[in-house]
């Protein structure tokens, strides 16, 4: 078979779609920041000639609401940037529908078909913990197969399919994706030497979501303080993880219109998707290494899982991203 003539062209950087996750306690302003970012990514804070004919950025914002229509409450209220939240498109996902990740995917694809430039899912906690979510599916499999260990439950086709859908919800090459996720405060019992008694103390916060999901987005923000339109106050969030050069991990940022516009411009200038995916693969390699170094049972089952995944003789550094995600999910299942 003859090889067709190769046509090589000089490659350019291409615009990249955002993949952003915002975590925080209830009332910390996750939804408000998500809407502000969505507005900004669609050029809401871009300088324009007053006479220019442009599409209202809110017309490109589509939302998937699992929080009892809480997003509706933002429409028309004063925003931190001095304007008001506009009217955007939205749909509600309820317990009657079921919170299966595949349902989120269906709604996201419908939004894109309808012209979405940004899809906000508020929140994705439900597709992990609520009715029809991944944990619900896992429990169904365990009830049918009570002797099956956790590692293999997560490898079952019906579980694996929803787990993959959960990951797919986080990013899409066709539009910007912003997700919110709830966190809970973790507590522990510690001895107070001064008072000579045990006390309950806070030891931080934890996402109400599958542990590895934090490796999927390119930017993960933790809410520090909500924004307000009256009095005017910009939301603040700490960068937990970033693959975007304009942010520094561990730093807390005030999300002003200028910062949102800087993010839009950065993505518009182009970020290599191959670079982002390789950074994601390295995140998973680091996470798997940590598990194997600190979990004896995981280290024991690791060779078996590798063989079942078809990478028996591969070094960890040689395993591709798709297989790494599958192996990671099985390792943290126990």
Description of each model-found segment:
Residues 25, 56-157, 161:
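Conserved inter-motif catalytic segment of the P-loop NTP-binding fold
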Residues 1-24, 28-35, 39, 48-56, ...:
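Interfaces that engage single-stranded nucleic acids at replication/repair/recombination sites
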Residues 43-44:
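Extreme N-terminal leader/anchor segments
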Residues 39, 112-113, 171:
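Residue-level signal for alpha-helix termini/capping positions
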Residues 17-21, 60, 117-120, 176-178:
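Residue-level preference for the first positions of well-ordered beta-strands
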Residues 27, 160, 167-258:
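Phosphate-binding/switch region of NTP-binding enzymes
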């Amino acid at each position: 078979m003859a090889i067709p003539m190769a046509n090589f062209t000089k490659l350019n950087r291409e615009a990249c779609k955002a993949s952003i996750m915002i975590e925080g306690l209830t009332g910390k302003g996750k939804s408000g920041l998500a809407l502000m970012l969505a507005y900004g990514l669609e050029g809401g804070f871009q300088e324009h000639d007053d006479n220019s004919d442009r599409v209202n950025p809110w017309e490109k914002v589509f939302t998937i609401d699992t929080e009892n229509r809480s997003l509706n409450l933002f429409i028309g209220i004063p925003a931190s940037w001095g304007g008001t939240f506009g009217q955007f498109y939205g749909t509600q996902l309820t317990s009657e529908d079921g919170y299966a990740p595949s349902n989120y995917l269906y709604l996201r694809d419908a939004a894109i078909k309808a012209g979405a430039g940004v899809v906000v899912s508020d929140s994705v906690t439900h597709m992990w913990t609520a009715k029809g979510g991944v944990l619900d599916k896992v429990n169904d499999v365990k009830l049918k197969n009570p002797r099956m260990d956790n590692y293999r439950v997560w490898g079952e086709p019906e579980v694996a399919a929803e787990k993959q859908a959960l990951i797919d919800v986080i990013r899409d090459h066709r539009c910007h994706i912003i997700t919110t996720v709830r966190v809970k405060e973790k507590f522990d019992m510690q001895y107070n030497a001064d008072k000579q008694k045990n006390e309950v103390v806070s030891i931080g916060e934890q996402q109400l979501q599958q542990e590895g999901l934090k490796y999927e987005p390119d930017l993960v923000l933790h809410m520090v303080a909500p924004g307000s339109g009256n009095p005017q106050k910009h939301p603040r969030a700490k960068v937990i993880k970033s693959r975007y050069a304009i942010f520094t991990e561990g730093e807390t940022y005030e999300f002003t219109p200028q910062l949102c516009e800087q993010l839009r411009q950065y993505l518009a200038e182009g970020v290599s998707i191959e670079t982002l995916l390789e950074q994601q693969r390295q995140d998973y390699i680091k996470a798997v290494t940590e598990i194997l170094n600190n979990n004896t049972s995981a280290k024991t089952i690791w060779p078996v899982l590798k063989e079942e995944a078809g990478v028996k003789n591969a070094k960890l550094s040689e395993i591709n991203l798709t297989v790494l995600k599958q192996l990671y999910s099985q390792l943290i299942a126990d």
